[in-house]
Amino acid sequence: MPTQPLRRAVLRRSWPFAALAAALAATTLVPGATAAGRATPSGTGKVVPPEQGTWVGTYQDATGPRVLKQTRVQDLEETLGRKEDVDHIYQGWTSEFPGWREQWDNLNGRVPFVSWAKASTAAINSGRYDGLIRQRAADVKAAGFPILLEWFWEMDGARNHHWAGSPASFIAAWKRIHTIFARAGVTNVSWVWCANAWGYVTGDAQRYYPGDAYVDWICADGYNWAPGRRGDEWRSFQYIFQSFYDWGSGRGKPLMIGEFGVQERKPGEKAQWLKDAADTLKTKFTAIKAVVYFDVKKRYNWRLETSSSARNAFRALAKTLQPPSTYP
């Protein structure tokens, strides 16, 4: 949902990963945490999706000090009665990452899902940002653990046309970034290409697809905008993501919902919407291997804490979709 480049102060690019890992392990590691079933044993390969089931994660409010950000994630996990599989992190175009958050997630058995903000594709294609991209590649490689990396999400949206340019310009920029990472020998990044769910209905999303050789996970962001947005009807999870699933499931790649959310309307409706979503994912959308809920109040109130019934429904969703043998 965030659409503007984000500016975050993170650790300097020269920070020692080994020292940070030791510090985080000593202070924040959750007892019994495990990354089983998530990545290659060496930690230098791509993110491997679960053979069965679906990973569940969220995006939590990123404001405040480090301890508050950690507490938000841990409080959610206490509510769920299980660990998150995926933690969604937004990083600005010029932000230095991976930082403490990605390292903390890896140590605690979560897959860090980094959304790297957009920049002008024309500027990228001119070579203006090659040095910055090389540095990000070097930092990701030095981290030594698998990362889901999504660059310029929702590129097909009306608010992003100025930045994305034509589909050809976007595709060229995507390939340029991908190629720089590959030439740097980065093997621990999985590329997530993510368009708007509605774009798969209109055909706009597919025009920006850079090709199977440049994408590891295919993704969509979608929301049930009613009742907050005037004129929108109440739509089910299946309705919102059906066109995405129809197109993406035929490409032989794992699918992901990078953002999804639902508002309260009548009592119990949000909970029922989440229950129906779990059933759809379990029985119909089996190629979707990760779903990430947008658990914040931004423009509308998507938070899971809007009602006890909604909170309990998401808890049930997380347990229903849990990959076998992922957790003790």
State the predicted function of each range.
Residues 88-90, 117-127, 161-167, 230-234, ...:
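The substrate-binding groove and active-site-proximal loops of carbohydrate-active enzymes
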Residues 131-147, 152-217, 221-240, 268-269, ...:
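Active-site cleft segment of glycoside hydrolase catalytic domains centered on the general acid/base Glu
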Residues 39-55:
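N-terminal low-complexity, Pro/Thr/Ser-rich intrinsically disordered segments
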Residues 56-146, 269, 273-288, 294-301, ...:
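N-terminal carbohydrate-binding/catalytic regions of secreted carbohydrate-active enzymes
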Residues 87, 149, 216-218, 259, ...:
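Conserved, mostly hydrophobic/aromatic
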Residues 57-61, 178-203, 252-265, 290-296:
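Aromatic-lined carbohydrate-recognition surfaces of secreted/lumenal glycan-active proteins
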Residues 1-38:
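Secretory targeting and sorting signals
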Residues 99-111, 115-117, 220-265:
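Glycoside hydrolase catalytic-domain groove-lining segments
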